[in-house]
């Protein structure tokens, strides 16, 4: 399993977008991480379709979209259209996560799942064969700057 450097753009100033992305391009980043939120699954909002489109126009790096929202399947076509290469869903945010993951792949994008700190690996074991990426949250989702949760580290080790 490969380890990748995927800096988050959550706190990126759109005023300095081009400069910041250029710096990330030459910094050795593998993938740029974009958080999108609906204000319900988590009590916050992230980047828009237009933000992703603008980021895509300014980099050739892969873009991953972390969908912190209920029923993300409603929007995967749009995120794919606007430039996402990898689309992460939270399995508990979707009624039938297997269907959404398969739809992501049919769009030619890489499906991924997110494991929140309080979720056991056993609960997502069946989904691992359907995804190319796993995002293990070491903070509670929704806001930047939250405290690192050390108890999650064994989950990361178990995945490797």
Language model feature labels by segment:
Residues 1-88, 93-96, 103-111, 121-131, ...:
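Conserved N-terminal beta1-alpha1 strand-loop-helix module at the mouth
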Residues 90-92, 137-140:
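Short beta->alpha connector loops at strand-helix junctions that form conserved
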Residues 38-39, 139-143:
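A short, flexible beta-alpha/helix-coil linker loop
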Residues 114-118:
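Short gly/ser/thr-rich secondary-structure transition/capping motifs
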